[in-house]
Amino acid sequence: MSHNSFGHLFRVTTFGESHGPAIGCVVDGCPPGLPLVEDDIQIFLDRRRPGQNRFMTQRQEADKVKILSGVFEDAQTGGQVTTGTPIALLIENTDQRSKDYEAIKDVYRPGHADYVYDAKYGVRDYRGGGRSSARETASRVAAGAVARKIIASVKIRGALVQMGPHKIDRAHWDWEEVDKNPFFCPDAAAARFFETYLDGVRKAGSSIGAVIEIVAENAPAGWGAPIYGKLDSEIAAALMSINAVKGVEIGEGFAAAELSGEDNADEMRSGNEGKPIFLSNHAGGVLGGISTGQPIVARFAVKPTSSILKPRQSIDRFGRESEIVTKGRHDPCVGIRAVPVGEAMVACVLADQFLRHRGQVGSGPAWPFPA
């Protein structure tokens, strides 16, 4: 299998399967001299960790990360810093229940990658989905923690803004609420509703989808490049690569098709020292594939978890029709734990774009230009 890496100068390769002994990643291209200890990574892994409440899979994984390489003691400070060499990160799997999959190992689960893995490779790890499992995303979160060290001045935050057909009230958006509820929801009233709503979905043995919004603030103007290195296209590709994601939009996204030209284009005024002030942010902080200095805003849609307790029709690998009930421990809304994953992927893209920008233009052009 190929295509397990992403990024250019900041490059991440993930490895491991859902029920294997461990998962992890190798981060290459991280500059030397950045303080990095396991606690810097663990804080983000803990936000994604399963089994924390009844709205997540009850698989109990500690997700304790180990840094295997790429760091050393700084002779001046005595602290641990990056060396500029590949950083290997390991997360052990400790709570696999492969027996849950024995009875259906030959049956293709509807909505899962079982059939296409067989069609492409002729062999697959049926235990928990193997490589296609969302378990792999823990490695991305670990890599994202390293990326944040490179772009420490950029604040990257995510939130769940829709569950099923129910959207939050954006007038009540409060970032302080995000880590106060199990849904990463910025609207306290919506979070209370989601609790009752998802309880009903869960008890019915079903699942539901969600929409996640990621906002990156303090990224300067100039990151990204035309034509095939566009910042928004790389963010979209990174978010689209997350398990169960079926759609991505930047800024107004598809809603821009409903606007007129005068409504959609973000007007500008002159601020301090001629620096532009944007009167709106329909573009989501990106124009022509290059950051504008405004908040970078991306949203992605996560489909309902395909593993549900209700019986469904399928076929097995021999072509025989079969009814399947998927047992095991699954998220009733996998979109919830996609929030820290989305943050991590945006962090990786921005770190990569920063390094590429620095490599191409150094500190950047002197702006504003003299009259």
Curated annotation (Swiss-Prot):
In which pathway does this enzyme or protein participate?
A: Metabolic intermediate biosynthesis; chorismate biosynthesis; chorismate from D-erythrose 4-phosphate and phosphoenolpyruvate: step 7/7
Q: What class of enzyme is it?
A: lyase
* Positions with a binding annotation for NADP(+): 48, 54
Tell me one GO molecular function of this protein. Answer: FMN binding
Organism superkingdom: Bacteria
Family annotation (InterPro entries): Chorismate_synth, Chorismate_synth_AroC_sf, Chorismate_synthase_CS
What GO CC terms are in its UniProt record?
cytosol
Please give a single GO biological process term from the UniProt record. chorismate biosynthetic process
Q: What does the protein in this record do?
A: This reaction introduces a second double bond into the aromatic ring system.
Cite the record's note on assembly: Homotetramer.
Q: What is this protein called?
A: Chorismate synthase
Annotated gene = aroC
